[in-house]
Amino acid sequence: MKALKSHPVIAALTLTLTASLAGFSLTHSARRGVAETRGALPDLPEANGAATLLPNGWHITPAGTHIPLPGDLPLKMVFSPDGKYLIVNTAGWHDHSVNVIDLATNKVAQSVNVGKNWAGMCLDQVGKTLLVSGGGSPEASFLKDAADMGATSEQLASFHHPILRLSYADGKLTPLTGLDIPGLSDNAEKIPNDYHINRERFVAGLAAGKNGAFYVVNTQNDTVYKTYVDADFMKSAPISVQVGYRPYACALSPDGETLAVSNWGDQSVTFIDTQSMKDYGRIKVGSHPNEMVWGKDGRLFVANSGSNSVSVIRGDKVTETIKTSLSPTDPIGSTPDALALSPDGKRLYVANADNNDVAVIDVSDRRESKVLGFIPTGWYPSALAIAPDGKTLYIGTGKGLRFRASAPATTPWTRTQPVSGLKYDYIGGLLSGTVSVVPVPNLHQLYAYTRQVYANVPKMPVEIERRAGPRALAERSLHNIKHVLYIIRENRAYDQVFGDIKTGNGDPDLTVFGEQVTPNAHALAEHYVLLDNLYANGEVSEDGHKWCDAAYATDFIEKAWPNSYSDRGEPDADERLTDSPAGALWDNCRKHGVTYRSYGEAADFTSTPDAPPVFTGDKGLAGHVNTEWAKFPFGVGRDTQRAAIFLKELNEAEKTGQWPQFMVAWLPEDHTQGLKPGAYTPVAAVASNDQALGMIVDGISHSRFWKDTAIFVIEDDAQNGPDHVDAHRTVGLVISPYVKRGQVDSTQYSTASLVHTMELILGLPPMTQYDRNAAPMLDSFTGSPDLTVYANIGSKVDLEAKNPATGPGAAASNRLDFSGPDRADPDALNAILWHALKPGQPLPAPVRSARLARQ
């Protein structure tokens, strides 16, 4: 198999660069068969020009001009038949809309609020009817909000349709009655009262075929439907076929005879004969296949979000695997999730959502495709389209170009209408969608774009042997640590807890759980290092725990949580879609001979009165969990009881000398249950969490293991708590004899920074691009250990205080679901907590900063 060369123009440009770029070559090509590509990551200086620094440490410098959308997370783009308009949906947390962009003015000419939709959209073959996937059945609370915000009876009734329908003519959309599929529709007569959620539906991909046929992918029941419609009604009962686990997209071959279906959770593509609707084959591809596009030559390109790759299928096999990451040797973390093919079939464009770029690939030679370069985008590109003339690329970004500052509170139903009683917005509402308009670059411009994309990646220090000074000494000291305890807590922002610490960048006016409530957290922050520039990678618990455990959230999680948290529902899925293909920290430990144990994190149990608990958590933790934790699921028991279980095992380890190298513990009580009658008060709940932290640190520091132990503490997310810097800024601690004393470390860190530092200690390789590139916490460590022990500080508040049966906030809290983390509306819960603890004071706005690094 011959080695492939880089593009000659790119190679020529390389020779003209300075010495720091010597050797950079985009030798980033696919080979014949399924062999992967080779390449090199250049050592680039910081690019010139304005850049936005994200909370995760990555920069964005989006190319082109930008069209704001009324909502977030655009997932599909469709051109009008005459090519004058681009139709774009938004399917995130706030406005779900279908938007018509006038390409002559690059402005949204029309926006239709559809309430809910998802990942499928197509025009029929005559270009007069637009079909849009309806996603799942919304929660009753969403319907109530929609009704309260002025939704018409027709709009409310439309939510029961699995497929939305709009007429299209001359750049204008007109809503029509939606389409039903037997078994997938809701009972419209029960909307909004006595509404029953249809758990069998979550409609994703759509494709329009010949003679009025169209094809519907239902992710929820692993089924594809074929049916026919005319202008007014469905002509016949649909024909269905089972495909792989959780299908996502469908694409018709150029001749219309074959339908390809990407099986999102099954690492495969199913091929269906459109005449007989028979499955005639399934081809294995990469992890988490999502979007697909056919070439006129019969090749099918499949984006594999969990493999940093595109599979090229020709005939009955994969003939190429094209790596789309910045280097072909990169671990996962690029997340290709959208494709566009130039009209001449020579260029493939691939949106790398988590790299914030579009890969440009020469696919003109069917034997060997080549990655030519990358175009920088906004935050999380999620949709692509190439103009019919091939001259302009349209890039939809799921999270926008920058952070949106404080604004009046809105609901998922409509972003444009303020909500009475709530003054400020929820974190989901702070995300924004855009369409970037980028002229297709020539190779010289593409090379400049490529340099910028590389410059946007967080820069890592050089190898330790090349270092000198305190940071080198600190990193070498990490190797003296043999045991790591990783404590994950729930949902607190920095200023909520540490805003009253004068030495840090805090705002005491925003502090609701200050030193009086959390004396141990405060003492530990002041005795060791105060981390006042630490940010959660995740927005909410659904992605936050994934970032904590695996330094990555899959594209399924990123596309599902905005729907779930806005009460529009989400498709059911197991670890095949929810978990990182690279595994979690405990999987990393297992692969490299590091002992590990979980105390509650990802360690679910089911139980019955007549049988012992059965472990149903992460498969990689089977046999490595503390089963006593099953007695205290979320909302049951106290964190002090959980800490006692941990200390019991620590005492046993003292006797044997055997203690795991890596341990992870979940202490969730600081989530609180609001003012739910009979539950522990928010202050008592957070104080119990703080006592548990103090107990654990006290116990470890007095043990034989203290001399070579490090404890890392993080919140899974900041959940939009009040913070004057950014709504992602969160509470974290690092505690060890090798941690500095009495210092403030204002280095910008993220959740992935903690993961990276723990990996360095344990001798583990990075799992993803995010932990690999995150700044390790070297500035918090020292080469001179201090073995001073820590003594738990007793609670200064009543740990047993409970909420009264009535009073402000009781009724609102009773309406919330506290059966699991974030099942309660986090925005409502934060408002309840603020008004309970800061009576008479207006709830402050969540702040979103454009640049977070301390100058």
What positions do the PLM features span?
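Intervening/peripheral non-core polypeptide segments
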Residues: 1-4, 106, 112-118, 122-132, ...
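Bacterial N-terminal signal peptides that target proteins for export
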Residues: 2-12
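Intrinsically disordered, low-complexity sequence elements enriched in Ser/Thr/Gly/Pro
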Residues: 3, 26-30, 36, 297, ...
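Bacterial N-terminal signal peptides
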Residues: 11-23
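Short amphipathic alpha-helical leader/targeting segments
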Residues: 13-14, 270, 291, 404, ...
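Predominantly soluble domains enriched in secretory-pathway, periplasmic, or organellar proteins
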Residues: 24-469
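N-terminal pro-sequences and low-complexity stem/linker regions of secreted or lumenal proteins
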Residues: 447-855
